[in-house]
Amino acid sequence: VPEIRQTREYATWYSRLRDVGAKARIDVRIRRMSLGNLGDVKFFGGIGELRIDYGPGYRVYFLKRGDVLIVLLCGGDKSTQASDIASAKTIAARWKE
């Protein structure tokens, strides 16, 4: 089972989510991901976009480091997707150093 770590940016985004239904769905998807079931994920430039088909279309961006580590970079929804991807790339670059 891979270890799951959260960046400060992800933790802040998640703590500000008010929709408990969204939080529950995100938690389930991350749990499934930790068990090897990535589900609806799109990869670009080494970054994964976990797509949650609920509400405004929540997204969780992550890095996968081998079979032992998944780093949750940041989150958002379909309306903030472009800026969230840019943020995820910046945060991922810090982890690659």
What are these model-predicted stretches?
Residues V1-G57, R65-I70, D77-E97:
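Basic, Lys/Arg-enriched alpha-helical interface segments
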